[in-house]
Amino acid sequence: MSKLVVCLTGMPGAGKSTIVSKLKEEGYETFSLGDGVRAEAKRQNLEPTGANLGKLMLELREKNGPGAIAELLKESIKESTHQIIIIDGVRSIHEINVLKETGNVKLLAVDAAPDTRFNFLRERKRSDDPLTREKFEERDNREIGVGLKEIIELADESIENNNVTINQMVESATKIFQKWIE
């Protein structure tokens, strides 16, 4: 049986990483495309600011093609002994095409209202999170520019992260995975 590769997508702050961290606690194997970029930034001795990571993401795609970020994780996914792999932060069809080389890919979109996302990102305080509405909108536009809007529209399923608990959101995602396995 080939691996089920569940790719989570959605705008920054929609709740993808929150779902992934809970699924990891439940024993799922998880990978983050953003972590791949952060690891590359560390390798290049770049400070992991939003501007630096965004610039690096674009440079990697320009230099190595639009699926470059997924290529950073492809071998690790192939080598995994888990039958279900969760991928956080897929942004383009090109990344999906790379990931299809590792197993049966399904795409789950996580959706949240802009105010919800902005407030979450401000509270999360990761080094690349925007602290102003202007930076938030710049980041959204950059993500849309690499194909995020199109990939969200192609999702096999989607879940809402507006006025729900983390557990409700994870439960919704898990039910979808189970349906995909059957």
Question: How would you label these PLM feature ranges?
Answer:
Residues I19:
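Hydrophobic positions on the alpha1 helix immediately C-terminal to the Walker A/P-loop
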Residues E29-I86, V90-N97, K135:
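ATP-dependent small-molecule kinase phosphotransfer cores
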Residues M11, L23:
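P-loop (Walker A) phosphate-binding loop of NTP-binding proteins
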Residues E29, K106, D156-E157:
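Well-ordered beta-strand positions
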Residues D88-G89, L99-K125:
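Conserved phosphate-donor/acceptor-positioning beta-strand/loop module used by diverse small-molecule
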Residues K16:
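Conserved lysine of the Walker
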Residues G67, R124-S172, I176:
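Small-molecule kinase domains that catalyze NTP-dependent phosphoryl transfer to phosphate-bearing small molecules
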